[in-house]
């Protein structure tokens, strides 16, 4: 079976923020160094590029992980039922997303809301998500290893996701420390529902994996967007800013 997941394009209006980035509250009073050298900008760019590539790699692994689980652990009838619900039934998707660990971390829905975000809140917004998924991936791997007969390829992909999330978390901390300094008081909530993987009901098990996969992909896309916005704040004239504006106008 081939996994058919529509790629979400959430929060399009948030992209409009880039053209008004310097109008944000607290931007001018943030910890950014206005006298950064070319070397500093290259360092930032390298870290952002690596972090974004890692995030994209994780999303690719996530797709393959769910596909491998579906092929080896789920009946074709149940698979088709859930895929149709995720693709066609928005109420079902909303129900799934309200179960994500970070649903309380509100993402702006329009330009007015985005302009109200204090610039120095970005470390908390990003690290809260990253910490949650870093810990959740460890829990997922522990649970999968405890399930008798779990396919080796499923466990191997879960290991790869866990390793890359840990690496992405380290790069994210480095980026945010360079720009803002140390970040404290991160929201340490994790994804809920993984215990359903141990349930005897096949549908509960598969839904738990679908929910994990979908929420992880949405959060990683959000983090990638925040990386772009931060990169523009560090270097307003970067190609990233131009690409975001082009994406918004398309």
UniProtKB/Swiss-Prot annotation:
InterPro entries assigned to the protein according to its UniProt record, in alphabetical order: 4_helix_cytokine-like_core, Somatotropin/Prolactin, Somatotropin_CS
Location in the cell: Secreted
Protein name, entry field: Prolactin-7A2
Glycosylation sites recorded in the entry for this protein: 26, 35, 102, 134
Disulfide pattern: 100-215, 232-241
Coiled-coil annotated residue ranges, if any: none
Keyword Secreted: yes
Domain of life: Eukaryota
One example GO MF annotation: hormone activity
Entry-linked SUPFAM superfamilies: 4-helical cytokines
GO biological process, one term: positive regulation of lactation
Family: Belongs to the somatotropin/prolactin family.
A Pfam family: Hormone_1
GO CC terms of this entry: extracellular space
């Amino acid at each position: 079976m081939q996994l058919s997941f529509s790629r979400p394009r959430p929060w399009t209006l948030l992209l409009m923020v880039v053209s008004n980035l310097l109008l944000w509250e607290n931007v001018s009073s943030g910890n950014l160094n206005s006298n950064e050298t070319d070397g500093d900008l290259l360092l930032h760019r390298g870290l952002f590029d690596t972090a974004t590539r890692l995030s994209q790699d994780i999303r690719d692994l996530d797709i393959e992980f769910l596909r491998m689980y579906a092929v080896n652990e789920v009946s074709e009838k149940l698979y088709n039922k859930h895929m149709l619900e995720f693709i066609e039934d928005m109420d079902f998707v909303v129900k799934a997303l309200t179960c994500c660990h970070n649903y309380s971390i509100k993402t702006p829905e329009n330009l007015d809301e985005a302009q109200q975000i204090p610039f120095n809140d970005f470390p908390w917004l990003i690290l809260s998500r990253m910490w949650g998924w870093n810990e959740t991936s460890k829990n997922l791997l522990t649970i999968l290893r405890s399930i008798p007969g779990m396919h080796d390829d499923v466990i191997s992909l879960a290991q790869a996701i866990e390793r890359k999330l840990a690496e992405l978390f380290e790069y994210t901390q480095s980026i945010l420390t360079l720009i803002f300094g140390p970040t404290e008081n991160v929201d340490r909530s994790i994804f809920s529902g993984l215990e359903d993987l141990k349930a005897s009901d096949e549908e509960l098990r598969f839904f738990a994996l679908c929910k994990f996969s979908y929420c992880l992909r949405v959060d990683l896309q959000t983090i990638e967007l925040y990386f772009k916005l931060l990169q523009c704040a560090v270097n307003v004239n970067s190609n990233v800013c131009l690409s975001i504006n082009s994406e918004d106008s398309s």
